[in-house]
Amino acid sequence: MGGPKIKYSFLFLCITFATIIPSLMAHIGHYDEVWRRRAEEAKEYARNIYEPHPENVTLAFNQKLRDTMKELKKVKGTHNNSTRRGLGTKKYTGPCMVTNPIDKCWRCDPNWADNRKKLADCAMGFGSKAIGGKDGEFYVVTDNSDDYNDPKPGTLRHAVIQKEPLWIIFKRGMNIRLHQEMIMQSDKTIDARGVNVHITKGAGITLQYIKNVIIHGLHIHDIVEGNGGMVRDAVDHIGIRTKSDGDGISIFGASYIWIDHVSMQRCYDGLIDAVEGSTGITISNGHFTDHNEVMLFGASDSSSIDQVMQITLAFNHFGKRLIQRMPRCRWGYIHVVNNDYTHWNMYAIGGSMHPTIIHQGNRFIAPPDIFKKQVTKREYNPESVWMQWTWRSEGNLFMNGAYFTESGDPEWSSKHKDLYDGISAAPAEDVTWMTRFAGVLGCKPGKPC
């Protein structure tokens, strides 16, 4: 009596396992027609938005940056001492003051809460075309519960699985524990300004095969792996997911993504990972602490699809108790500009598979250990190979013995004078000031943020 049942059960397990194996990297347990279509559409979209001359984007970024900084520096002198990031815990209590061009776009407007969608015009860099849910209605999250099979109206998961554009805000501060990874649909803004919203002690946020997303003002911390199972990813689709990695934010084959003013720490895997052909991404004004593998841009040396990856990393503070990967890159083109690296315990910038990484106007403070002063780390390749990769350091500030090992054509700048003259970033000496308000802001409606 037991024999046939055992055989049928074994056959079912074999079929199920065979179905899961090809898509383990995507965490899709059953790669059905919906996911196949999403994947193909996402790949085609990424190919279409790929910037064949990425230096044009860095040029535009730094031109706007320099123009804005000229204006901001006129008032910097009167506030410099009170806005420096100090060693104590005192918070800035003076009048609203912006320190970089992204924040200048919206922050000091006392009516920001009545004009939230102004934020959609403020992105810069490779993610500058991300407008999120600007063309949609507002959705107010009122409930911090989470049902990953049948999300309840008023919850964050219910908001992000809708098919139409939405600008998602929160009625009150809340802690949200996601029982499985929260899989988003395209054309969404998660805007937590004015309240304290924590995604914590559960799974993270997944942006898979979608486009046009803004995430602003979230605390994301203490993220763990999701166990997998049946998870709803749209109002009209639910499917089997394998175990999630435990990333804070996982960007998988997604395009036009802007992550701004987030505070992140202690996730099981990465804080922010961007893989499998993700492109058109800006990560700005973030504050990152207490983590090992901070950011991964490109997950595999064999994933040549990441050649389309183009990412801007700007005005972020990489802070206390970080260890490595700020970021760790493969393939792609990464612009690392005006960030403050005050802590690392292994290295700051790493990579393999010849990514192009342009570092401009950053501050690097090395740890006390004399064996950990180098900012950079190349992996899995001999020097004869990685010396061909374009890793350039321009206008960076190195402190406490920090040093950057460049590679690629040493005459790169002089050979690109038409571009080089326009792409110098703001001075690294100003980075502490420019990143003073990195992380979640303490915004209150009716007052400048």
From Swiss-Prot:
Keyword Magnesium carried by entry: no
This protein's record includes keyword Iron-sulfur: no
Tissue and organ distribution: Expressed in anthers and pollen.
SUPFAM superfamilies per record: Pectin lyase-like
Residues at the active site: R325
Domain of life: Eukaryota
One of the Pfam families matching this protein, by short name: Pec_lyase_N
Cofactor(s) named in the record: Ca(2+)
Catalytic activity as recorded in UniProt: Eliminative cleavage of (1->4)-alpha-D-galacturonan to give oligosaccharides with 4-deoxy-alpha-D-galact-4-enuronosyl groups at their non-reducing ends
Record Gene3D superfamilies: Single-stranded right-handed beta-helix, Pectin lyase-like
GO biological process terms held by the UniProt record: pectin catabolic process
Listed GO MF terms: metal ion binding; pectate lyase activity
Role according to the record: Might be needed during pollen development and tube growth.
Protein name as catalogued: Probable pectate lyase P59
